[in-house]
């Protein structure tokens, strides 16, 4: 019987990690990468895992969620983390890398691996057999059409327009109230009421806030029905007051009166630990977002776990179509990995590739599927993309402590809480490793 070869499409961070995990387990891999045959608007080299934005893989401390994620991956022999450690440059508490050395390490490792066959070509259809699609946010039109045919017409998004997401524990609950507009249905929103003076201060700050630059390949019409709130503000005060900050039907139960303006917060996860700021999709720089958001009553000291973004980002509606192993539901042979699955960030993308790669290897070796515990950062990300209860408006997410189950005992001090969650994650990981 011919040996099974797994196709990994895309040699970014997720695809490179998936290919490595497969190859290290004795599985033959066709790693299919269209560069340099066809370049993307964002890439400049023919190397694998090219970092197209920042050279930072973010925080390295275990009081930082992505730091915990990196440590979990380090303990699972992640190629991406090995490369990052080898190519590290000074960056304080962050793990930053020399881009050239980082990509070179990964490229050389995979090209010299006896189980990896590199194929440089653009494909417009999904290969037959076991396949991991890891083509990233700039997936070509032909392949995107094929993915739509397989997943369903409403399951592939081309623009990431997400409002900021915050931790519930950091909201000043004395200043907000639970209510749905006109009391329809259950009280599902936390409402931050504003006086006219507070609104004016907020409005002026929005007008003065600095927007992020837009890449050429992102300049498309994604504002229809999803306009950045700072663009609404530029059209005049009333645009916000008749839009996302409309107070009608949201009387404050403490006063019985209608506030001048209201910012609504909507639960974003099943556990109720994360909330998004309704209608606040934005192009503002992250520092500007924090300053503006902290002018909202009740959010003066809020912890933002995911800033608002609007950019080109091809991703699927994962809660409807993917399992926790990153496998397409109802299709034993097809897996996805990387930003396309709804994980956000370099490290998160690589982690999804690690999970997908291990699972395909286990399937071919007749071993049990690998579902990481939710207490781990790897497991919490896999659970989020497959179970998010906002599947009608699913948006990508990066690693954060709001995704893992709460500790049994509530700890008010944030640093201590994060340390305990980190220790728990690594304990669970070590125990889980014994089953791999």
From Swiss-Prot:
Pfam short name (any one): GIDA
Predominant location category: cytoplasm
EC supergroup of this enzyme: transferase
Listed name of the protein: Methylenetetrahydrofolate--tRNA-(uracil-5-)-methyltransferase TrmFO
Keyword tRNA processing appears in the UniProt entry: yes
Function per UniProt: Catalyzes the folate-dependent formation of 5-methyl-uridine at position 54 (M-5-U54) in all tRNAs.
EC number: 2.1.1.74
Listed PANTHER family: GLUCOSE INHIBITED DIVISION PROTEIN A, METHYLENETETRAHYDROFOLATE--TRNA-(URACIL-5-)-METHYLTRANSFERASE TRMFO
Family in the record: Belongs to the MnmG family. TrmFO subfamily.
Localization of this protein: Cytoplasm
Keyword tRNA processing: yes
The reaction(s) this protein catalyses: uridine(54) in tRNA + (6R)-5,10-methylene-5,6,7,8-tetrahydrofolate + NADH + H(+) = 5-methyluridine(54) in tRNA + (6S)-5,6,7,8-tetrahydrofolate + NAD(+); uridine(54) in tRNA + (6R)-5,10-methylene-5,6,7,8-tetrahydrofolate + NADPH + H(+) = 5-methyluridine(54) in tRNA + (6S)-5,6,7,8-tetrahydrofolate + NADP(+)
Highest taxon of the lineage: Bacteria
PROSITE patterns according to UniProt: GIDA_2 (PS01281)
Positions annotated to bind FAD: 10-15
Keywords: Cytoplasm, FAD, Flavoprotein, Methyltransferase, NAD, NADP, Transferase, tRNA processing
An annotated GO BP: tRNA wobble uridine modification
Cofactor: FAD
Molecular function GO terms recorded: flavin adenine dinucleotide binding; tRNA (uracil(54)-C5)-methyltransferase activity, 5,10-methylenetetrahydrofolate-dependent
Gene Ontology CC annotation, any one: cytosol
């Amino acid at each position: 019987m011919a040996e099974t070869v797994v196709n990994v499409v895309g040699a970014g961070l997720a695809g490179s990690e998936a290919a490595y995990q497969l190859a290290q387990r004795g599985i033959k891999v066709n790693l299919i990468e269209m560069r340099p045959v066809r370049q993307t608007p964002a890439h400049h080299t023919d190397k694998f895992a090219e970092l197209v934005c920042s050279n930072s893989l973010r925080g390295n401390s275990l009081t930082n969620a992505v730091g915990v994620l990196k440590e979990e991956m380090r303990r699972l022999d992640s190629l991406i983390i090995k490369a990052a450690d080898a190519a590290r440059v000074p960056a304080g508490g962050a793990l930053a890398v020399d881009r050239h050395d980082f990509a070179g390490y990964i490229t050389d490792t995979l090209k010299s691996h006896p189980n990896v066959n590199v194929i440089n070509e653009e494909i417009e259809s999904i290969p037959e057999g076991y396949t991991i699609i890891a083509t990233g946010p700039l997936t070509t039109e032909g392949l995107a059409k094929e993915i739509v045919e397989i997943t369903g017409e409403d399951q592939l998004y081309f623009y990431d327009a997400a409002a900021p997401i915050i931790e519930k524990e950091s909201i000043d609950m004395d200043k907000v109230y639970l209510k749905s507009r006109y009391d329809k249905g259950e009280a599902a929103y936390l409402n931050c009421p504003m006086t006219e003076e507070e609104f004016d201060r907020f409005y002026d700050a929005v007008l003065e806030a600095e927007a992020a630059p837009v890449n050429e390949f992102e300049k498309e019409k994604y504002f229809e029905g999803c306009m950045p709130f700072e663009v609404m503000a530029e059209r005049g005060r009333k645009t916000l007051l008749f839009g996302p900050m409309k107070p009608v039907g949201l009387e404050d139960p403490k006063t019985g009166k209608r506030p001048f303006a209201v910012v609504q917060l909507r639960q974003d996860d099943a556990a109720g630990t994360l909330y998004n700021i309704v209608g606040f999709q934005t192009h503002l720089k992250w520092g500007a977002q924090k300053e503006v958001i902290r002018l909202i009553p009740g959010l003066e000291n809020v912890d933002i776990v995911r800033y608002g973004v609007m950019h080109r980002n091809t991703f699927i509606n994962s809660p409807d179509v993917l399992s926790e192993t990153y496998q397409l539901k109802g299709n034993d042979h097809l897996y996805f990995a990387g930003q396309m699955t709804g994980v956000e960030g370099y490290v998160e993308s690589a982690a999804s590739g690690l999970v997908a790669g291990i699972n395909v290897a286990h399937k071919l070796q007749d071993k049990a599927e690998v579902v990481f515990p939710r207490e781990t950062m790897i497991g919490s990300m896999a659970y989020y993309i497959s179970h998010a209860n906002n599947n009608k408006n699913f948006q990508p997410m990066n690693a954060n402590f709001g995704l893992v189950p709460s500790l049994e005992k509530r700890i008010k001090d944030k640093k201590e809480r994060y340390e305990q969650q980190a220790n728990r994650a690594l304990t669970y990981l070590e125990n889980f490793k014994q089953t791999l």
